[in-house]
């Protein structure tokens, strides 16, 4: 009996590595030392930072992965994986430096895995983050046929003096919300239930002319390059930032707000995108549940001083980023620190 007889095909793994090498190399930065295949991936941090603070993050894509597998859409789910990780470390002002992925399946399909890793490499390239390593695990009997799991890991760096930790947030600061590309990678257990119960055809078109399934599978927006540019040019105006993920607007922005302060969010400041309107209507989802489950069209939030908010908004306009002034920091209302209305 051989390892292949037991369900592990080493040759398929080697074929995958050869397929993805050119894709991965496109994401490399000058600091990357060596290529793929080593026991450890190397990154030279010596040249750019004086007092670097390393910021790490890890995440998956939730059950959006289940929907991607059902639809056979493997080429963009890797972008979601990168976005969930790099947008998180960006919150503290960090530039994502490198990324590693974990791909696990019962039987390795080289074409599927190459499509997934290609998306990861593309997400890294768009974020200026090097895909320097990963693990492909073929584990017979662990997963149903055709299914796989994903996890991502990133490390970023920020100068210690420029670290954003929320300490500068003040009463009266303004919340500037930057548009999301859709649900990103959160709320998909609810989304899948609504989608199944609604019985909507695959070709169902939303009010804006987008196919429903395209809106649901739109890759997570990558905020790294535009936000790092803002930090470089207008860093003094930004007191904190938030990535709107699981927990929605209700639970994410407040994570970077000091005790004693709260948030007033004006839900009329922007229009709920059609995909979220469809989900709320078809799922009979209450407003409060929408706010604490989905990003509702706001994927990233900048918290800025009132005096400099207009300048920051002009800089966002210059980058063609859709944005809205969605609220402000206020004294906390007892135990109720977040009000949306």
Swiss-Prot record:
Its EC number is 6.3.3.1. InterPro entries: PurM-like_C_dom (IPR010918), PurM-like_C_sf (IPR036676), PurM-like_N (IPR016188), PurM-like_N_sf (IPR036921), PurM_cligase (IPR004733). It is an enzyme of class 6 (ligase). Keywords: ATP-binding, Cytoplasm, Ligase, Nucleotide-binding, Purine biosynthesis. It is found in: Cytoplasm. Signal peptide: none annotated. One of its GO terms (molecular function) is phosphoribosylformylglycinamidine cyclo-ligase activity. Belongs to the AIR synthase family. This is Phosphoribosylformylglycinamidine cyclo-ligase.
């Amino acid at each position: 009996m051989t390892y292949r007889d037991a369900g592990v095909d080493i040759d398929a793994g080697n074929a995958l590595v050869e397929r993805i090498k050119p894709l991965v190399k496109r994401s490399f930065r000058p600091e990357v030392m060596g290529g793929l295949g080593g026991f450890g991936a190397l990154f030279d941090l010596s040249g750019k930072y004086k007092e670097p603070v390393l910021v790490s993050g890890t995440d998956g894509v939730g059950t959006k992965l289940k929907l991607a597998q059902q639809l056979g859409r493997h080429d963009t789910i890797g972008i979601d994986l990168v976005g969930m990780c790099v947008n998180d470390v960006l919150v503290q002002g960090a530039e994502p430096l490198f990324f590693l992925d974990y791909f696990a399946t019962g039987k390795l399909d080289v074409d599927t895995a190459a499509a997934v890793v290609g998306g990861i490499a593309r997400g890294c390239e768009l974020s200026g983050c090097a895909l320097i390593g990963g693990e492909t695990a073929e584990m017979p009997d662990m997963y149903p046929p055709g299914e796989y799991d994903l996890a991502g890991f990133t490390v970023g760096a920020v100068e210690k003096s420029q670290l954003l930790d929320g300490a500068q947030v003040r009463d009266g600061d303004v919340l500037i919300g930057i548009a999301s590309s859709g649900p990103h990678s959160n709320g998909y257990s609810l989304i899948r239930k609504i989608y199944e119960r609604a019985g909507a055809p695959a070709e169902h078109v939303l009010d804006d002319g987008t196919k429903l399934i395209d809106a649901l599978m739109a890759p997570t927006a990558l905020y790294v390059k535009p936000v790092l540019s803002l930090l470089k040019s207008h860093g003094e105006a930004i007191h904190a930032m938030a990535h709107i993920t699981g927990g929605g607007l209700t639970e994410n922005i407040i994570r970077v707000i000091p005790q004693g302060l709260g948030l007033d969010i004006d839900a009329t400041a922007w229009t709920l995108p059609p995909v979220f309107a469809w989900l709320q209507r078809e799922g009979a989802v209450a407003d409060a549940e929408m706010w604490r489950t989905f990003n509702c069209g706001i994927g990233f939030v900048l918290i800025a001083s009132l005096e400099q908010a207009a300048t920051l908004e002009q800089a966002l306009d210059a980058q063609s980023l859709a944005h809205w002034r969605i609220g402000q920091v206020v004294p906390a209302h007892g135990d109720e620190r977040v009000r949306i209305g």
